[in-house]
């Protein structure tokens, strides 16, 4: 069955506003919960190497449910899928508040996030299309990064005051996201009537993976976004250990302020990409990707707070300019070939596999005692080389 299209071309329709508000609150909860739960692990004397494990169980849920969540997003009204997913996040955050093992609660939040992602991005192609899709992605990324900015800081600051208050604030944010989802128009399902046989769904997902991988443009987008988000998540945990070593600061809030600088930069970079890059000129984003790695390397050598703030903001600007066009390219090409929900689910598999791999390597490096500054230097250099190799490959093909 061909994919249905339900498009309102206005960037500020009622449906788009509801999506942006819901995304802000959901992402706010995600980021506040990460730092609140990290503070809980510190308070309960978990070892340092267990910190990235928290994120690994989260992304593990993405990988486990990757064959199914794309079809869920395309088989039901995406706004209702988003509401159900935020309900799962609310349940996970509440369970941590009530003393359930934080790794189990965070895994449940990961399941909700896995179901949420294909729907939140797939709905953009139903609310707008064509040249405005890049701008819609810019709005989505700006909302997400604003939530990262405020959520990360709120999680750290509230955790310094009282960990339980920080966790409760996360649950309230997810509750607000559920309410906002109610106001998203109930559009017809994009691809209703598909088989729910798990074996067939897995086979269909693998076919979608193969289809997107065989297309040069979507393969390029998948590799680029996977490298970016894998590196971005690893950088967040690197900062948690880097701050006390390089700056001599041991509170919960300083790493969140530094993460906020990255978030501010991504908002700026996403806005610039929406104005300067189109689907036909996506390769313009590649130099920014290389510079991310170079600046991370320079950042790792800093010992003063102000240069650290400036360099992290620059990393964010480069990151926003790099990833927004790649997201839009995958959505536009993927919607036509395998469906928007399936395309985003495949993207999630790639991104979260990269996160799992990079976090695993980082956790292992910390466990064996490699100092955090050399880890940062090697991390930045390898990322710059990887994006350079991707650009060379893209130009040759």
UniProtKB/Swiss-Prot annotation:
Coiled coil: none annotated. It is found in: Cell inner membrane. CDD domains: MFS_MefA_like (cd06173). Gene3D superfamilies: MFS general substrate transporter like domains. It is a multi-pass membrane protein. Belongs to the major facilitator superfamily. LplT (TC 2.A.1.42) family. Catalyzes the facilitated diffusion of 2-acyl-glycero-3-phosphoethanolamine (2-acyl-GPE) into the cell. NCBIfam families: PRK11195.1. This is Lysophospholipid transporter LplT. It comes from Shigella boydii serotype 4 (strain Sb227). The gene is lplT.
